[in-house]
C-alpha cells in the first residue's frame, strides 16, 4: 500500500514522501521552493521563467488515471500566473532514463512560479492525480530570454529537452561557454523555432543536473532534419563535452490540449 504524506518545509512549500515498501522511501519534490526574496527573484521583463517536471509513472498505472493526470495538470492553465503549460507523454528518450511524461510551463517571474506552486488547486492536483501513480519525479527551473511574440509553442510542434550534469569544479567561465554554445544553436540550425537555456535555480529537485535547455521545432521532420546533420551536431557537442558528466535528453510533442496565454 502506498501512502503520500505532505510536510510543509521552510525551503519547500510542499515536500512529498512516498513509501513504496517498508524499507524504501522516495522523496519526490514536485513544487518549487518559495525561498525567493523580492530583490533576488524579480525577473527583468526581457526574460521568462522556464519550469520543467519529469515524471515516471508506475508500471502498473491505469491508463485512465494517467490521462487524468495529464488533463488535470494542463487545466491549471487558468491560474493567473501561468503563461503556458503543456503536459504530455515522452515521444523519444535519447539517454538512460525511465521517465515517461513531461510538464513544461512558463512564468513571468520566480514569484509567479512560487505562487503557482503554492496554489491550492495545484497542490490538490499533485496530491490526488500525480503522486498516487508516479514513483519518480524531478524538476528544473531556469531564467531564460523571453521568446518573441507568444510564449506558447504551437500544438503539434516538437520539443527537445536537454539536461546537463556537469563535472565537479567546473568554473563559471565554462558554464557561460556551455550556455553560449547552446544559445547559438538556433543560428546554426534554422529548423529550430525557439530555444532557451539557463542554469537551474532549484538544485534540490534536479538530481544534480545544473544546466537545462529546451528547443522547439515546427514538427518531427524539422527535428529529424537537424539530427541528420551529424557532423555539425557532433562539432557542437565537442565544444562542451569535457565539462559534462552526464545528460538527459528527451523529446515530446505539444498536445492540442496544451494551454497558454500571450505576453
From Swiss-Prot:
Keyword Coiled coil annotated: no
Major subcellular site: other
GO cellular component, one term: chloroplast stroma
Keyword Ribonucleoprotein: no
Keyword annotations of the record: Peroxisome, Stress response
Alphabetical list of Pfam families matching this protein: Dabb
Chain positions of motif Peroxisomal targeting signal: 261-263
Ranges for domain Stress-response A/B barrel: 49-142, 158-252
Disulfide bonds listed in the record: none
InterPro entries, sorted: Dabb, Dimeric_a/b-barrel, HS1/DABB1-like
Protein location: Peroxisome
Record's function text: Involved in stress response.
Subunit organization: Homodimer.
Record protein name field: Stress-response A/B barrel domain-containing protein UP3
Phylogenetic lineage: Eukaryota, Viridiplantae, Streptophyta, Embryophyta, Tracheophyta
Name of the coding gene: UP3
